[in-house]
């Protein structure tokens, strides 16, 4: 059963069960690598490191996703249609969160998500 994204004043929380956020970030990073190798004209990866991913899609949208191992959060900046949007830091507290957070990031990566106002920092 999927979890839900709960918006707080300063952060987002994925309401599910606990698995490490680092694993979620690593899966997302590998997903970007896979997309780069298989959709050659669709994505331009600018940086792909253990704690940061920066890439641009052919429609001009670009994304910077960082993982902070000290605070254990993912922070995402999205540049959509010449607009700079910073998504609130993502904190994950309880158990099945790996799949949910990965799905959230996957939706963002594939332009399938409607970014809600309460998610914006």
For the regions a protein language model found, what residue spans apply to each?
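Short aromatic-glycine-(Arg/Gly/Cys) micro-motifs in beta-strand/loop hairpins
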Residues: 2-13, 72-82
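Mixed-charge, Lys/Arg-enriched low-complexity segments
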Residues: 7, 14-15, 22-43, 83-121
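Surface-exposed beta-strand edges and their flanking turn/coil or helix-capping segments
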Residues: 20, 68-70, 79-80, 105
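Amphipathic, interaction-prone secondary-structure segments
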Residues: 42-78
């Amino acid at each position: 059963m999927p979890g839900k994204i709960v918006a707080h004043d300063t952060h987002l929380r994925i309401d599910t069960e606990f698995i490490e956020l680092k694993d979620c970030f690593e899966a997302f990073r590998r997903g970007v690598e896979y997309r780069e190798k298989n959709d050659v004209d669709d994505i331009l990866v600018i940086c792909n490191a253990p704690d940061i991913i920066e890439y641009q899609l052919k429609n001009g949208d670009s994304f910077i996703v960082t993982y902070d191992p000290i605070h254990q959060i993912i922070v995402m900046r999205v540049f959509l249609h010449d607009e700079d949007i910073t998504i609130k830091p993502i904190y994950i507290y309880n158990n099945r969160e790996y799949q949910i957070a990965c799905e959230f990031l996957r939706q963002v990566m594939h332009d399938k998500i409607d970014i809600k106002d309460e998610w914006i920092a």
